[in-house]
Amino acid sequence: MERTILIVDDNPDDIEITRVVLAATGRKEKLEAVRSGAAALHRLRSGEDLPVLILLDLKTPGMSGIDTLRQIRIDERLKHIPLIMVTASSFGPDEQDAYDAGADAFLYKAFDLDEFGRNLNSLLERFLKE
């Protein structure tokens, strides 16, 4: 079975950057992207194979990333999936809110792609031991 990372982000440029950064780190997981929290929950509850990790953008249209995270954490089938909350925002209490809602890690989308790649790969290695 192929291991999948689910990316939840409404910005196609950010999705592509994440794909490029992950490819540069040598990760072998298949990447799947959805554009909203509602779409993520639909995908996760569809009966398809579950992803091994979720990268969830904090700011998504409709249902926020925090609300999406809360829904994932109360679902018995989904609550064990490691989840990294990602944001471009560097203002506000976002990081603590994410941890309070059940995020396993919090990652700022850096303007330096090398830094973003190193941080992301470090977290993936921590959560996705082969």
Can you annotate each of these PLM segments?
Residues 60-62:
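Receiver (REC) domain active-site loop signature in two-component systems and cognate sites
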Residues 56-58, 87:
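Active-site residues of response regulator receiver
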Residues 111-123:
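C-terminal output helix
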Residues 2-22, 54:
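Conserved acidic segment of CheY-like receiver
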Residues 33-53:
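Acidic, metal-coordinating helix/loop segments flanking the phosphotransfer/catalytic sites
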